[in-house]
């Protein structure tokens, strides 16, 4: 079937209705995922993007654009066929309205419209509509622009033609009339715990889609910041380029990834695999562009074929005989990075989250194609094949050595009744769910922790010095490390693929407690590397935590208080600074106590907005512009200029303001020298400017003129939020002695209990992995053998580093 024929058949009669959106609003988690942790929020974008990608899979689209708008909404555009706009016979309204308002409506139920698809078209976009405060739909089809608006899932305007579609100016269809769909939506605050999109989370998924669909260009833009950001995601190499991207911080054993492509029994397979010199496997599986975290029939088929082909080659080449080892499946996958993508007409998954593929017809197709492709490659590349199999044989030898070491340890443990490490101060509680273990840096801190702990349910394990970097060590070498052996024994869950059992771990809270200096951060990173590489299930189950000892101790007279970080320190200084203070406003009103504290909190939020915008203009100019209403809906340049005069000193001329081509321009003469300030449109449309404008509505009346802040015998002139925050913080510091902690050893047992061990008062950070491939890349870059990726990381993040010297 040609593209033209397919386009002709995709009309109103392609849309099948199966009804109702109320269920979505009542039980959003069933349709979109968790509405509290951000996964459901980002899934809203994925649902719309998946529709655009499905157009690309069907051969009708080449470009997708995702924009995070300054007002918090998202726009997704594609240059596909455009949603059908003709009337739907069964529903009596346009097909576009059916798709957007009926739960089970779409073109994915009709094999003529889409051969394969990631999800059910109408389900996804109608759910997005139901869970949005508003959604605007723009369709280019039949040479016309069609527009429609929805609020809370209901149409508030009918689909109407608003103009003619423009002509394409670039790409393979240049000169033709533009077709495509644009969806802009604002997620509902009533449904989601927060509605701010995370750029990195979206970028990760969009990059995956660009790799999996070579030839499709995805433009990702973020217009929320002062400096607009954009990235073009386009990879001609497809999943071969994906594997290279995943392995960019590792040393490859082959010049290029092995690629296997083919179609068998309507199952399309696209595979790329590449061995490197690391000791860890990285495997990503996709079905119709959807990732399977738990694998499934495609993964088991690939592994079976890989093990069979490699074992066969190792035997026929004589390498097995020479090395005197027997190969296992895990040996073949040591140092392997692989991306496996299958396209299946009607995939079946084990659950609604689609984390595991269970379609039985996929297994023989994948196994057959992989066996055939790998056999051919091994025959055509004998030297590289030999290098791979030699590495695998070495892995098998190391595995055997590690097995013998474990057997010795087991026998020793069986004979030794007190097999727990001598340094471990264990707890009396035997229920793992109630037990905690603190892994402490050094013997001195370990001694304090042992005295401070609650012996009923808190164990302490001090580790001296830096533990082995397991990223650069093979399994047998790792087992020979005393510190790692101590850690493994204390946890009681075993180690290695065959012996590790997370159900046997003796503590369900494993807390890393290191100093707040560079050495402490390094030791914590080494421990995290160990847990991520050797016991990832403990991270997945949420058992690993990082202790947050206080950073500061603030003392005044005989009283003292511990403060965990800079934010808590600032909050404490504000409380101190407001205590006994008063603010006399220009209106004659006086603010004190809770009213003043609430005002200062609002001013701190406004200051945070101003600080982020200050890269483009002076902070005081932004502040006074906001207070004049310049960032709101009715900007007045003259009013903003008048407010700027509050900062004028003797000899300064008055400010004047006007609207220029690219923003507002303010100028004055200061001691004979012309001065000019520009608040450009980029700043005016930034998300922080919008939030600042909302806060300024409340602040404008309070700061109508110069105010006076008084505390004890000192008074300060206040012209806006910036002056007030600085005056309060200065007042709060007066008479305080502030001590900064760097090591746990600096605290005595009582202090350690009060700040870090007491479950009622402490702060713990739970370690979680959102994207395994990103985590894998980060550990490889920072902890691996290659120096260049580490240098690049330092250069990229140097400005964000906070280093205590």
From Swiss-Prot:
<comment type="subunit">
    <text>Heterotetramer, composed of two GyrA and two GyrB chains. In the heterotetramer, GyrA contains the active site tyrosine that forms a transient covalent intermediate with DNA, while GyrB binds cofactors and catalyzes ATP hydrolysis.</text>
</comment>
<dbReference type="GO" id="GO:0003918">
    <property type="term" value="F:DNA topoisomerase type II (double strand cut, ATP-hydrolyzing) activity"/>
</dbReference>
<dbReference type="GO" id="GO:0006265">
    <property type="term" value="P:DNA topological change"/>
</dbReference>
<keyword id="KW-0799">Topoisomerase</keyword>
<comment type="similarity">
    <text>Belongs to the type II topoisomerase GyrB family.</text>
</comment>
<keyword id="KW-0413">Isomerase</keyword>
<dbReference type="Pfam" id="PF00986">
    <property type="entry name" value="DNA_gyraseB_C"/>
</dbReference>
<keyword id="KW-0547">Nucleotide-binding</keyword>
<dbReference type="Pfam" id="PF01751">
    <property type="entry name" value="Toprim"/>
</dbReference>
<dbReference type="GO" id="GO:0006261">
    <property type="term" value="P:DNA-templated DNA replication"/>
</dbReference>
<keyword id="KW-0963">Cytoplasm</keyword>
<feature type="domain" description="Toprim">
    <location>
        <begin position="435"/>
        <end position="550"/>
    </location>
</feature>
<dbReference type="GO" id="GO:0046872">
    <property type="term" value="F:metal ion binding"/>
</dbReference>
<dbReference type="InterPro" id="IPR006171">
    <property type="entry name" value="TOPRIM_dom"/>
</dbReference>
<dbReference type="Pfam" id="PF02518">
    <property type="entry name" value="HATPase_c"/>
</dbReference>
<dbReference type="Pfam" id="PF21249">
    <property type="entry name" value="GyrB_hook"/>
</dbReference>
<keyword id="KW-0460">Magnesium</keyword>
<keyword id="KW-0238">DNA-binding</keyword>
<feature type="binding site">
    <location>
        <position position="515"/>
    </location>
    <ligand>
        <name>Mg(2+) 1</name>
    </ligand>
</feature>
<dbReference type="InterPro" id="IPR013759">
    <property type="entry name" value="Topo_IIA_B_C"/>
</dbReference>
<dbReference type="InterPro" id="IPR013760">
    <property type="entry name" value="Topo_IIA-like_dom_sf"/>
</dbReference>
<feature type="site" description="Interaction with DNA">
    <location>
        <position position="466"/>
    </location>
</feature>
<dbReference type="Pfam" id="PF00204">
    <property type="entry name" value="DNA_gyraseB"/>
</dbReference>
<dbReference type="GO" id="GO:0005524">
    <property type="term" value="F:ATP binding"/>
</dbReference>
<dbReference type="InterPro" id="IPR018522">
    <property type="entry name" value="TopoIIA_CS"/>
</dbReference>
<dbReference type="InterPro" id="IPR000565">
    <property type="entry name" value="Topo_IIA_B"/>
</dbReference>
<feature type="binding site">
    <location>
        <position position="515"/>
    </location>
    <ligand>
        <name>Mg(2+) 2</name>
    </ligand>
</feature>
<feature type="binding site">
    <location>
        <position position="441"/>
    </location>
    <ligand>
        <name>Mg(2+) 1</name>
    </ligand>
</feature>
<dbReference type="InterPro" id="IPR036890">
    <property type="entry name" value="HATPase_C_sf"/>
</dbReference>
<feature type="site" description="Interaction with DNA">
    <location>
        <position position="469"/>
    </location>
</feature>
<dbReference type="GO" id="GO:0005694">
    <property type="term" value="C:chromosome"/>
</dbReference>
<dbReference type="InterPro" id="IPR034160">
    <property type="entry name" value="TOPRIM_GyrB"/>
</dbReference>
<dbReference type="GO" id="GO:0003677">
    <property type="term" value="F:DNA binding"/>
</dbReference>
<dbReference type="InterPro" id="IPR011557">
    <property type="entry name" value="GyrB"/>
</dbReference>
<dbReference type="InterPro" id="IPR020568">
    <property type="entry name" value="Ribosomal_Su5_D2-typ_SF"/>
</dbReference>
<dbReference type="InterPro" id="IPR049353">
    <property type="entry name" value="GyrB_hook"/>
</dbReference>
<keyword id="KW-0067">ATP-binding</keyword>
<comment type="function">
    <text>A type II topoisomerase that negatively supercoils closed circular double-stranded (ds) DNA in an ATP-dependent manner to modulate DNA topology and maintain chromosomes in an underwound state. Negative supercoiling favors strand separation, and DNA replication, transcription, recombination and repair, all of which involve strand separation. Also able to catalyze the interconversion of other topological isomers of dsDNA rings, including catenanes and knotted rings. Type II topoisomerases break and join 2 DNA strands simultaneously in an ATP-dependent manner.</text>
</comment>
<dbReference type="InterPro" id="IPR014721">
    <property type="entry name" value="Ribsml_uS5_D2-typ_fold_subgr"/>
</dbReference>
<dbReference type="InterPro" id="IPR001241">
    <property type="entry name" value="Topo_IIA"/>
</dbReference>
<protein>
    <recommendedName>
        <fullName>DNA gyrase subunit B</fullName>
        <ecNumber>5.6.2.2</ecNumber>
    </recommendedName>
</protein>
<dbReference type="InterPro" id="IPR013506">
    <property type="entry name" value="Topo_IIA_bsu_dom2"/>
</dbReference>
